[in-house]
């Protein structure tokens, strides 16, 4: 039995124990984790500094460096997120529906843990804590495989989690991490279907492709966010600029940040110079289509010609594609061709246009007069999220607690036999 099989077997055994825990016991463990994250913050931050130094030396982009960075404020927020998970309702054991059949059998459909979840992710140290806390709350064990960029940070945070579990009399194997950077171990994890019940990759398109093609475990993909906002012909310009500013500026490296702005041709001449002035204030580079370039070339913001490939990639930086479309249908067509089914928005004062856009755009989150930055487990009231699913089965959008459960049928009888 190799390393991964040992980890898988230990995780499966831990999952059976976790599935039997009361909500109070799970919350106790989460509270201890949150407290230890704070008391051991210097150890974790020092580990993160080692990862940051190595990442800078390797030439990592500023966008990815921002994702990798832990600050005292970010770590405190992560600890508070764990406490927020404590306060969330536990879905395990909840009766979804039920009925009394003509046969006399009382039938219930009840939420239960999935079992063991595997998560593969890149330069996102917060994922370690977010995923572990959600899995523990739902009675699932988890095997984590972070990128080599987060090696020391993940090592420190998993150590804290395992210490907390042991303090609460729970198996440390409930949260395990694959520490070796050997990529072969990822391939082995993808085939660990004897022990792992669901796999969640959080990374780029190449990782998602690898998991879809090689995994023998059910995979939930998502997190790649080529997010769009369409400025309709009757949008309120000043309010629209505020929404665009939030969607692009607040955290450019986030997967729910705005990447492509589509502007109705009827308002492009007036709106685009205003956009240029607003984006200039934040150092945003505009990547303009041939149609948009004449209205942006003399503006305040830096502008370059958009490349065809730009429409299909995440910038994750202070860059924004800008194109002009003839009408709402052209905007929808653009989103269908280039979007990733993550988060897309329309800015409009027309109720009929808003409803049409919502029905036509097939993304996991669609917004009317709101920023794409809202696609987040915390913002949706779900607590921390394990991922943002852009597929339709078994979960869609920010994956909170319910998405980490399945259900079983339970029948109660009085020595019933089938006639």
Swiss-Prot record:
Pfam families (UniProt xref): Aldedh
EC number(s) recorded for this UniProt protein: 1.2.1.41
CDD domains in UniProt: ALDH_F18-19_ProA-GPR
The keyword Phosphoprotein belongs to this UniProt entry's keyword annotation: no
Keyword list, A-Z: Amino-acid biosynthesis, Cytoplasm, NADP, Oxidoreductase, Proline biosynthesis
One Gene Ontology molecular-function label: NADP binding
Catalyses which reaction(s): L-glutamate 5-semialdehyde + phosphate + NADP(+) = L-glutamyl 5-phosphate + NADPH + H(+)
GO biological process: L-proline biosynthetic process
Subcellular location: Cytoplasm
Main location: cytoplasm
Pathway assigned to this chain's UniProt record: Amino-acid biosynthesis; L-proline biosynthesis; L-glutamate 5-semialdehyde from L-glutamate: step 2/2
Any one Gene Ontology cellular component term annotated for this protein: cytoplasm
Family: Belongs to the gamma-glutamyl phosphate reductase family.
Purpose of the protein: Catalyzes the NADPH-dependent reduction of L-glutamate 5-phosphate into L-glutamate 5-semialdehyde and phosphate. The product spontaneously undergoes cyclization to form 1-pyrroline-5-carboxylate.
UniProt name for this protein: Gamma-glutamyl phosphate reductase
